[in-house]
């Protein structure tokens, strides 16, 4: 069944999310497995090697001793040591990471791998690759995905299913391709991260075509995590997103007439939801031209006049101010694109634009501090192919430190990584269901890149390699009336139930609105 989205400025269709394919039943893999309908359950939730066996002390020692010893052999002093260090640092780092990622033991061996040969999962097109990667001779994950995108290897089964058993056929050794991207792609972007770079990357990504995103995001057109309300049932993608919109509005204590600034508003779904159901006055900010047109059309179709709410196409640094500051500022998974270099100044700007009794809601993706090598390889893949420039995905401690330094007080934090996994699982199925249309317009390579991204991200967000946090904040000043925020100090479940009670008239308000009642 298909339907035309009433807000779309383009003529294309959405499909209903296809039913989940049958998951390979988990054998006795040594650890407990689950079977909740809400998520894609892991058949083998295994841990691999990571930070607990990585020696920073040894690495630093090598970085210091090798140039020092080399300089000493020729009678050199400090200046000679520094000179040699310029040439030895990168080779030492590359060799150390390559060796460590190859020989480090697993974090634990509680979970038993299925133990099937490489050829059970993968079909290589060249005789050389078939001879190289077979039996127990695993392929480095970075080498695999580059070959997969180039059409040199195929899965013999559903991509997500094969990736669930990736430890049978892939290793997580750091390769030359990873080092090349890290040194000549990731690091330069991290250091520069200019305004023009932001604009170029965002528009190249989000203005690719609304249909490209619609074919996995579905009718809500929301590119951020939804929220599960019941782990014992499979809610639709649209229900997950409606849950999230309600949670956001209740966590910030949204009231009629509140001025709201939504930074990185995407296609404007939150702006429309807050305008229709809560009577808020919303200004959405995005660099995407397509998103701006879509969002404004959606607001007008829902009966929201431009004098109440609007979507503006501009850099966040140029966001309009209002007298006294916005009552609410929301930022859902846009801050990662600000970059580490500008993260502190971005938060300072948000603080300056917020009313002294206002609320700031930040939903931000991040990585775990106790990393495993596959987390880092996944992160570099994401930076190269999916979100170039989004280098502010960090452990939670960094985010909290920057928020407090910018003058905020944390009111509440919820971790929603597994909710993201549930969302991604539905996006993945939508992508497969629209596969032929994607290939016809954008080509096999783009289809495969997003297939891999959505499948692997379903796994990594479920197992904690990458996660996402909802952080509710107020200004940390003496005149903030903290007592007035007690009634809206919700966790995820409480916020959803409050939305039903306050504006839902017994049921959760829907984001699918074409005319304001």
Curated annotation (Swiss-Prot):
EC number per UniProt: 2.1.1.317
Protein name according to UniProt: Sphingolipid C9-methyltransferase A
Cellular location(s): Membrane
Residues with glycosylation annotation: 290, 478
Catalytic activity, reaction form: a (4E,8E)-4-sphinga-4,8-dienine ceramide + S-adenosyl-L-methionine = a 9-methyl-(4E,8E)-sphinga-4,8-dienine ceramide + S-adenosyl-L-homocysteine + H(+)
Gene3D superfamilies, per the entry: Vaccinia Virus protein VP39
Membrane topology: Multi-pass membrane protein
UniProt-annotated binding residues for S-adenosyl-L-methionine: 223-224, 286-291, 316-317
Chief location category: membrane
Organism the protein comes from: Emericella nidulans (strain FGSC A4 / ATCC 38163 / CBS 112.46 / NRRL 194 / M139)
Function: Catalyzes methylation of the sphingoid base component of glucosylceramides (GluCers) at the C9-position. Sphingolipid C9-methylation requires 4,8-desaturated ceramides as substrates. Glucosylceramides play important roles in growth, differentiation and pathogenicity. The methyl group at the C9-position distinguishes fungal glucosylceramides from those of plants and animals and may thus play a role in host-pathogen interactions enabling the host to recognize the fungal attack and initiate specific defense responses.
Keywords recorded for this protein, A-Z: Glycoprotein, Lipid biosynthesis, Lipid metabolism, Membrane, Methyltransferase, S-adenosyl-L-methionine, Sphingolipid metabolism, Transferase, Transmembrane, Transmembrane helix, Virulence
